[in-house]
Amino acid sequence: MKVNLEWIIKQLQMIVKRAYTPFSNFKVACMIIANNQTFFGVNIENSSFPVTLCAERSAIASMVTSGHRKIDYVFVYFNTKNKSNSPCGMCRQNLLEFSHQKTKLFCIDNDSSYKQFSIDELLMNGFKKS
């Protein structure tokens, strides 16, 4: 499957506005493609910080709720120009759970620059089910 990264970035730029970030204002949006279907998520902060939901896990929940279990592509959009943004450890483990060897992950900054990773590059020696 060929992806249109320009279109995906435009979608994520619209979706990221839905993030609920009253504490950090660090907005993140995620699009997952699984079996040619798209699933979106945004980060949702909570005054009890451990309850905060990351955009990646939000998108995974949508995907699983729709009956899908294998991620083909992950696009994570950050509202900063940090150049070193990437999923947190908890999200990396969750992404690994539903990824396969060919899963591709893109980390995109708000200037549309991006870095591409494989799931193994993102989480080397991750804990996998047997």
Curated annotation (Swiss-Prot):
Cofactor(s) essential for the protein: Zn(2+)
Cofactor note: Binds 1 zinc ion.
EC assignment: 3.5.4.5
Gene3D superfamilies associated with the record: Cytidine Deaminase, domain 2 (3.40.140.10)
Keywords: Hydrolase, Metal-binding, Zinc
Residue intervals of the CMP/dCMP-type deaminase domain: 3-130
Catalysed reactions, semicolon-separated: cytidine + H2O + H(+) = uridine + NH4(+); 2'-deoxycytidine + H2O + H(+) = 2'-deoxyuridine + NH4(+)
GO biological process, one term: cytidine deamination
Catalytic-site annotation from UniProt: E56 (proton donor)
GO molecular function, one term: identical protein binding
Transmembrane annotation, as ranges: none
Chain residues that bind Zn(2+): C54, C88, C91
Family: Belongs to the cytidine and deoxycytidylate deaminase family.
Subunit composition and interactions: Homodimer.
PANTHER family for this protein: CYTIDINE DEAMINASE
Designated name of the protein: Cytidine deaminase
Organism name: Mycoplasma genitalium (strain ATCC 33530 / DSM 19775 / NCTC 10195 / G37) (Mycoplasmoides genitalium)
High-level lineage: Bacteria, Bacillati, Mycoplasmatota, Mycoplasmoidales, Mycoplasmoidaceae
